């Protein structure tokens, strides 16, 4: 059923061709209208004052003023849900991670003939993300400071020791900025491994893992097929691969594979969480954080049935209360906590689990 009031979107891109593609995609949905366009950051700032759009799609690389600088100004003066439009390149990935830290809600891949994603799938993703962004509570719309890296966090790569306990974390929309807060607070001596699924395309997960590694006392890396899961390390599922944990020669080992998408995504958290529950049993903590959809809910059930401990982010601090809500509705969540308590709750849960 169409909304009573259309979602008004401003499209910002220096390419007239790209603005046309995005306009056509957005206006193919009856609930969305493109209220205005801008060719660069300066024009975007001028138009956001007068047009007051509900959502902005913002290119990163533009002349005069780039997307990051425009984002910082908009979030500080005219807080509006912003979705970054990012090239699927390493530079694009790194800039996008910065944008999410500064306050962008989400990002979409820039449509092009070279990207390996069909147009219908891309259309559905863009429209879904714009609709979710339009619902984001105003309290989340603000310029955030990027974390300054402490010299004390320069850490030696720990010698590998196979983990006997594990924390399985699922996150999607709003996840990157929220996970940074969690990882910043976790101790370096966790005596457990972390397995993390954050819905992101290839390349972006590597940049995100590197960013987490820089702000965390734990060692964080993008997972590789066949590597042993070690304690005090965190493994981020790479974009476009499902990640599971299996036992190989008695050691927990990463398995990556390109199976069918689950809940429309790859990587998906459910197969990862179920596999962690199988390998680690009651020595598992499951965590579901902000994101749209219901990925992670089945994983929470699997972990609880094996005797593990389960945690979900609360509604008030979730940028999108979809995945945590689905997890909570299973009736299998032990602790529903705000974002700033997730790290402490993980540590507390691990204290209850045998080493």
From Swiss-Prot:
The keyword Nucleotide-binding does not apply. It catalyses: [protein]-L-glutamate 5-O-methyl ester + H2O = L-glutamyl-[protein] + methanol + H(+); L-glutaminyl-[protein] + H2O = L-glutamyl-[protein] + NH4(+). Phosphorylated by CheA. Phosphorylation of the N-terminal regulatory domain activates the methylesterase activity. One of its GO terms (cellular component) is cytoplasm. The keyword Flavoprotein does not apply. Keywords: Chemotaxis, Cytoplasm, Hydrolase, Phosphoprotein. It is an enzyme of class 3 (hydrolase). Residues 8-125 form the Response regulatory domain. PROSITE patterns: CHEB (PS50122), RESPONSE_REGULATORY (PS50110). One of its GO terms (biological process) is chemotaxis. Residues 160-353 form the CheB-type methylesterase domain. Contains a C-terminal catalytic domain, and an N-terminal region which modulates catalytic activity. This is Protein-glutamate methylesterase/protein-glutamine glutaminase. It comes from Thermococcus kodakarensis (strain ATCC BAA-918 / JCM 12380 / KOD1).
């Amino acid at each position: 059923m169409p909304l009573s009031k259309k979602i008004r979107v401003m499209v910002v891109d220096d390419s007239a061709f790209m603005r046309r593609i995005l306009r056509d995609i957005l206006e193919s949905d009856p609930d969305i209208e493109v209220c205005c366009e801008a060719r660069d950051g300066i024009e975007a700032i001028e138009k956001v004052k007068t047009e007051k759009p509900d959502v902005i799609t913002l290119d990163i690389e533009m002349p005069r003023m780039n997307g990051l600088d425009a984002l910082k100004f908009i979030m500080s003066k005219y807080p509006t849900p912003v979705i970054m439009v990012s090239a699927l390149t390493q530079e694009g990935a790194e800039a996008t991670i910065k944008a999410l830290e500064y306050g962008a809600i989400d990002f979409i891949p820039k449509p092009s003939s070279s990207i390996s994603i069909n147009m219908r799938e891309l259309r559905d993703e863009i429209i879904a993300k714009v609709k979710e962004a339009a619902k984001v509570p105003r309290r989340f719309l603000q310029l955030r400071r990027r974390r300054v890296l402490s010299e004390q966090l320069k850490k030696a790569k720990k010698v590998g020791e196979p983990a006997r306990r594990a924390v399985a974390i699922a996150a999607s929309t709003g996840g990157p900025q929220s996970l940074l807060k969690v990882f910043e607070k976790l101790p370096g001596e966790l005596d457990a491994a972390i397995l993390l699924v954050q819905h992101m395309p290839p390349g972006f997960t590597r940049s995100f893992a590197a960013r987490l590694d820089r702000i965390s006392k734990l060692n964080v890396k993008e997972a590789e097929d066949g590597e042993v899961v070690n304690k005090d390390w965190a493994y981020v599922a790479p974009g476009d691969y499902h990640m599971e944990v299996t036992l190989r020669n008695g050691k927990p080992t990463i398995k990556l594979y390109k199976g069918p998408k689950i809940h429309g995504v790859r990587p998906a958290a459910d197969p990862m969480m179920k596999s962690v529950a199988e390998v680690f049993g009651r020595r598992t903590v499951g965590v579901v954080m902000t994101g749209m959809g219901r990925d992670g809910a089945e994983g929470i059930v699997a972990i609880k049935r094996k005797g593990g401990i389960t945690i979900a982010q609360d509604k008030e601090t979730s940028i999108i209360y979809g995945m945590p809500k689905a997890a909570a509705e299973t009736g299998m969540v032990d602790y529903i906590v705000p974002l700033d308590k997730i790290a402490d709750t993980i540590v507390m849960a691990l204290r209850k689990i045998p080493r």
